């Protein structure tokens, strides 16, 4: 009897040991973390930041003193500074425009030039590391032949989402983060914005840890039970980095999504966005592609995480809010209902100001859209948030993205030198440009008319050019079961219907006949059901008419008892 008990105890111990070993080996391991000697104790805190933008040649913006560097020039400057390693995460790799369509714009050559520079890193003895979703890309294969280390992350199996992060880390000293993908259109036809940060190894090392997390997930089909300590965040919203940027004091940290990709101490993107909104005292300016506070599945469910904070800022703190949203084929019609709902809060309310505009792309001869405002940032009187995800519920639950928060105190003498003021100037320039339109009652925005009145090119989310043939993929994988479950504040789990930015496979016979299939992203048109939502708040004022929008010089505002106010630009 006693020997039997001993056997049971030994067997139990062996089982525990086996489980422990399995947990250890399931953790993501990061190699080479301290090769260059940079640690959180000796990292550099005296940094310089520069805004980088791609503004298409045919978009004319007033010069309001906004200082920015062309995106291509900024990326080249990072490559010029590289000594040991360049790490890149991008949702797309479509730099060689000639593979898809004849390049009708000289600016499209920038993509091929950047690809050539990346290929040339090998000759300089510089290592190129890339983390990518499971995409089929000629560019990635070409770079792999030039000794680039390409690791693929199976997001379908891990979260049923997509890898949408877009950033560079160079030698763990310099980095870029912003809206641009490694896509020739990000260097030519799209309006993009990001920030380059130089000689800032503290933040660069922290962003490198986000890269290392993706890098270590290559081909895994489950979320590790725990993360390596070397992936823990160095800074977060409760313990930000105190540093100097452009000779002014500031605080900063890196955020990321989704929650299942959050190691210890890392703030997620929703926490970062919430913090920036809650800390605002005078204004909140938001420039985003899509704004849709819904969780989408067969039925839509109201998602209040961001929308509720904006309402609180308007009503309780009397903070002025401006919302600049891209107007394009994939703009969800319910977006306008939510914006009207926000504006209605300021009816008959003193010192309440909510304004909304749409950045209008241009319709090309072939019917495609060009010049979509691809920006994804928020600026307040105290801080900025610059991220990779749109403000749609499913984005934060399933897709991988990263963000940068920088806060700077008020009362700085040379306010124009601060990143906060530079980003505000960029927002103001866009807001008052002739390319923006205000939402008016009883008038349908041109982007939705464009969508409803002609066949939509078969394309995935956030593509502003015409249809392009996809190259057959070899990494297509079916969803695999996850080890971890997802929760969102009591909401039921829903599967994302968001599509990434890769060109969608097109039936060329149908395209030749002028009919191209419509691919929706996070909606089922005509069958929208909303639960947990006061539908009376979403009732649009009047019915949409087939009328053009207001002229560029008109700005809509809800402020006190005013329904509309005119502003001459």
Which residues fall in each region the model found?
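Charged, low-complexity intrinsically disordered terminal segments
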Residues: 1-477, 481-569
